Amino acid sequence: MRTSQYLLSTLKEVPADAEVVSHQLMLRAGMIRKLASGLYSWLPTGLRVLRKVENIVREEMDNAGAIEVSMPVVQPADLWQESGRWVQYGPELLRFTDRGARAFVLGPTHEEVITDLIRNEVSSYKQLPLNFYQIQTKFRDEVRPRFGVMRSREFVMKDAYSFHTSQASLQATYDAMYQAYSAIFTRMGLEFRAVQADTGSIGGSASHEFQVLAGSGEDDIVFSTASDYAANIELAEAVAPAAARAAPGEDMRLVNTPDARTIAELVAQFSLPVEKTVKTLLVRAREDAGHPLVALMVRGDHHLNDVKAEKLPQVAAPLTFASEEEIRLAVGAGPGSLGPVNLPLPLVIDRSVAVMSDFAAGANAEGKHFFGINWERDLPLPQVADLRKVVEGDISPDGNGTLQIKRGIEVGHIFQLGTKYSEAMKATVQGEDGRNQTLTMGCYGIGITRVVVAAIEQNHDDRGILWPETLAPFNVAILPMNMHKSFRVKEVAEDLYQQLQARGIDVLLDDRKERPGVMFADMELIGVPHQLVIGDRNLDTEEIEYKNRRSGEKRMIKLSAIVDFLVSEIATAK
């Protein structure tokens, strides 16, 4: 490609509305341009990277035995009503009607469509297992699009769906997809972790996220310092304290605390260790629970894990915290005065709370707390569960090492769906025994556009992007100095350009009438890994200046050796 026939569209200044590095660099490097909130056009440089991501994904999916298909982005509403997600999915699902007043959705995902397709096309267990994938634009009506294409409303996704007649068959495909995803992100040169995850609104029995480590990530991921254990913080188990509960050392007493409405105020005013305090949170109960609210209790220095709380059998989903009005109606006191003593609601406490002694908690009366509370002396031990978020330094759930927490960008997610969709949509095949058998499903997604974001977040410096070799829009940039004035420079540049193209290398020849400083800055910004500077002086010794974008290394290389050198460098990096 020649810059004279290309739209480079680089920017010198950082756009004011770009918050994270990837958004800033994608705009400055001429990769994307905003059309409306959460909607972006992909310019040539960005699209070249996007296509390279797609190609790697496609190759590995094909290698794993998946079959590529293409399904409509517009989907009939009745399929979503049949699966039950018409209501469950909420306002992120863009709904509309056509001129015939028929209801449709703009697809955020395709479980319903693929299930409908397979129930009409596959009739026997002999045709299974099958795994289908597509790479397609999706739409989710995000309430607050942000960070460029990291969280946009329209995005490109690879979604795959597998169909089976047994859990063992599903597990085999799930494992194959796990390995394929690991190969995909390894080929892309990304530092990532595969972590246990919650199944969320997709549903199912097992799930792993593939998280690229980045400080700007939206997720907290947890992993062991001494083993392969890794999980999303929502799912990470907080191991029960090893130490037994200490014997009571104080009598329980009622204390006036009119100015202590928070844990921080209580600790400051009474010089209490925060580890000797508890937080009591009220959430709405299931309709059949017998009480309108359920009380959940964690230690004062810990935080409730909403995902764990929502999985309690007596807690309503989605998790909803009680309003102050509901709290006062149920307990007779405000949120800052809640505690376990004489609480007229069912109570579930975290494992760490179960081993506490001589602790302080609200007295369920305005401006009062009990100090010196002890389980089984002052009140019976209630239901105990894992309720809290883990913290750095906790013991790893597998018993090996301690936990570290880092931020991550989710780029892939695989699920064992089981029969959630096939049961709802009556997707069956004739089993080996001749009877109808409900299909067992898996689904496997990769955010193609998010991969581009994650790669930039992990690979940049103060001059621009440092693309991994496999994702770079161009592998080589040829920068001829004054080629429009020097026939020799132009001839060498053109010859090199033709040779590199013939060897299958993506090369950009900068044939603009621009100052060298502008040419260098643009190539640094868009992140071309290998740069060749051709000048009259160096051609006197038949040499070219080579610069490696990532390492900054510069060296002179003989003109006769440069093509083989680049082919070797690129092959090694890939």
UniProtKB/Swiss-Prot annotation:
E.C. no: 6.1.1.15
GO molecular function, one term: proline-tRNA ligase activity
Source species: Sodalis glossinidius (strain morsitans)
Domain remarks: Consists of three domains: the N-terminal catalytic domain, the editing domain and the C-terminal anticodon-binding domain.
Species classification: Bacteria, Pseudomonadati, Pseudomonadota, Gammaproteobacteria, Enterobacterales
Family matches, as Pfam families: HGTP_anticodon (PF03129), tRNA-synt_2b (PF00587), tRNA_edit (PF04073)
Enzyme class, spelled out: ligase
A GO BP annotation: prolyl-tRNA aminoacylation
Keyword field: Aminoacyl-tRNA synthetase, ATP-binding, Cytoplasm, Ligase, Nucleotide-binding, Protein biosynthesis
Source superkingdom: Bacteria
Gene name linked to the record: proS
Cellular localization per UniProt: Cytoplasm
Role, per record: Catalyzes the attachment of proline to tRNA(Pro) in a two-step reaction: proline is first activated by ATP to form Pro-AMP and then transferred to the acceptor end of tRNA(Pro). As ProRS can inadvertently accommodate and process non-cognate amino acids such as alanine and cysteine, to avoid such errors it has two additional distinct editing activities against alanine. One activity is designated as 'pretransfer' editing and involves the tRNA(Pro)-independent hydrolysis of activated Ala-AMP.
Protein name: Proline--tRNA ligase
Catalysed reaction equations from the record: tRNA(Pro) + L-proline + ATP = L-prolyl-tRNA(Pro) + AMP + diphosphate
Chief site of localization: cytoplasm
